[in-house]
Amino acid sequence: MKLAYWMYAGPAHIGTLRVASSFKNVHSIMHAPLGDDYFNVMRSMLERERDFTPVTTSVVDRQVLARGSDEKVIRNIVRKDGEEQPDLIVVTPTCTSSILQEDLHHFVRQAQLSSRCDVLLADVNHYRVNELQAAERTLHQIVEFYINKARKSGELSGPPRRTERPSCNILGISSLGFHHAHDLRELKKLLQDLGIELNLVIPQGASVHNLKHLGRAWFNVVPYRELGPMTARYLQEQFGTPYVEITPMGVVETARFIRQIQQVLNEQGIPVDYEPYIQEQTLYVSQAAWFSRSIDCQNLTGKKAVVFGDCTHAAAITKILAREMGVHVVWAGSYCTYDGEWFQAEVGGYCDQVLLTEDHTRVADAIAQVEPAAIFGTQMERHVGKRLRIPCGVISAPMHVQDFPIGYRPFLGYEGANQIVDLIYNSFTLGMEDHLLEVFGGHDTKEVIHKSLSADSDLIWTREAQAELNKVPGFVRGKVKRNTEKFARERGLTEITLEVMYAAKEALGA
C-alpha cells in the first residue's frame, strides 16, 4: 500500500467488484467504511446501464469497531440472499477494512449455512495487488469454484464433450473495461466470419451456472493481457483447451490472431485456410491498410509520439504507430509494472525507450522533456496534454465518461483498426493548423507555454524576450523556448533577454 495523489490502477476491491458485477445474477457485499463505496456511483455513471449496480456496502462504523463485524456481515449476506435471490454472493473487504484482520472466511462459512445461494470470499491480498491483478485472480477463483462444484455433484465427470462445430470462449470482457462492449461485438463478427461458434463469454453477461460448460469449447480467446490469461491457463490444465492470446489490434496483429486460430484448428483436425479472408479484409474491406499508404498518412512519417497505458493497449498502439503508420515513437510505457518483462519484449524494437512506472508525475515530466507531436495515453495523459497544449488520444484505461462512447467504437478487429487510424490521424496537429488558429484568433496565445510540469523554470524572461517568443509560431515555440533556456543554462545565465535569444538562435544555426 502507498498513499498516492492519483493512481492508474485502482485498489484491489475495484477489480473484484468489476468481475463480480459483470456476471448475471451475482451480488457483491463490500465490507468497507464509507469512502470506499464509490464503485456503485462510478459504474452507474460510466457504463450507462439500466440496471442497478449489484453491490451492497456492509459499512464498517464505530459500532463495528467496538463489537466486531461478524453479526453485521452475516446479516447482510442472508438479507441480500432473500431479497435479490442471486446465484452467488461475493464478499470482499477493502484495503482499509483489511486492517481489522477479521476472519471473513469464518463469516462466509456461517452465512452459507443460512443462505440458498453460494457465498464466496474473494481470495485477494489487498495490500499486494492492484485492481487489474485482483480482477484476474477473482475471475479465476469463480471459474475454479464452479468447475469443482460441478465435479463434486457429478455434473462434470470425465472430459467434457466438445461442441459439434468449432467454438471458442472469450475470456476477459468485463464491466468498466476500455471499449470492451464494442470489442466484444467486433470479435463476435470476426469469429462468425471465420465460421467459429461462440460457446461462452466471461465474465460479461455470463451465468455462473454455465461455467461448467467452458470445457466444451475447442479453444479460448484472451484478447487482453490484464484479464483472462490466468483462467485460460487453468482451463488448459483442466481440459487441455488451447488458447489464443494475440490481441487483434491493428491490421498486422489481427492477421496474426487469425493465423493462430487457423493453426489451433488445423492441429485439431480441421483443415481451414483463412489466408483468402485475411487478404480480402486487408486489401479491400479494411480502410486502415489503404490509408497507411496514402499521402495523408505520409504526413505523419517521422512525427514524434509517446504512448502510455496498460500493457495490452500501449504495446498494440506502439506497434501500429511505428510499423503501420511510420510514426517515430520516442518512448512507450505502461503502469502495469508487474508485467514489465513482457511489455519490454513486445515494444523494445518499436520505440527508443521503455518507461515502466505507476507515478504519473514521472510520465508527465517525460512528456514535457520530449515535446512530442501527439500523446497516446490514459485520462491522466489527456490532462497533461491540455496543460502542455499537446494533442492526446486516449487509448487505455483509466478513462473518463467520454471514453465510454454511445456509438460503435471498437479497438479490436478490422473495424477497430479503422477506428484506431482515425484516432491517431486526428490526434496530430497537421501542417500550419496551429499557426493559422493563432493568426485568426483561434485561441488565446498571450501566455508563453511552459514545458515543465514538476518544477517551474529557474530562468527569468524579460518582457521584451517574452514578447519576441510569443511571435514564434505555436507549433515550434516550445522548441525555441527549450533551446534558448538550454543555451542560457550552459553559460550560467539567470535572465533571458533579447540578446540571449538572438545569440542562442545564432549558436544553433536556427
Swiss-Prot record:
This protein's record includes keyword Secreted: no
Enzyme Commission code(s) on record: 1.3.7.7
GO aspect biological process, one term: photosynthesis, dark reaction
Superkingdom per UniProt: Bacteria
Catalysed reactions, as listed in the record: chlorophyllide a + oxidized 2[4Fe-4S]-[ferredoxin] + 2 ADP + 2 phosphate = protochlorophyllide a + reduced 2[4Fe-4S]-[ferredoxin] + 2 ATP + 2 H2O
Residues binding [4Fe-4S] cluster, per UniProt: D36
Gene3D superfamilies in the cross-refs: 1.20.89.20, Nitrogenase molybdenum iron protein domain, Proto-chlorophyllide reductase 57 kD subunit B
Record text on cofactor binding: Binds 1 [4Fe-4S] cluster per heterodimer. The cluster is bound at the heterodimer interface by residues from both subunits.
Keywords: 4Fe-4S, ATP-binding, Chlorophyll biosynthesis, Iron, Iron-sulfur, Metal-binding, Nucleotide-binding, Oxidoreductase, Photosynthesis
Pfam families assigned: Oxidored_nitro (PF00148), PCP_red (PF08369)
Similarity-based family: Belongs to the ChlB/BchB/BchZ family.
Record's protein name: Light-independent protochlorophyllide reductase subunit B
Gene that this sequence comes from: chlB
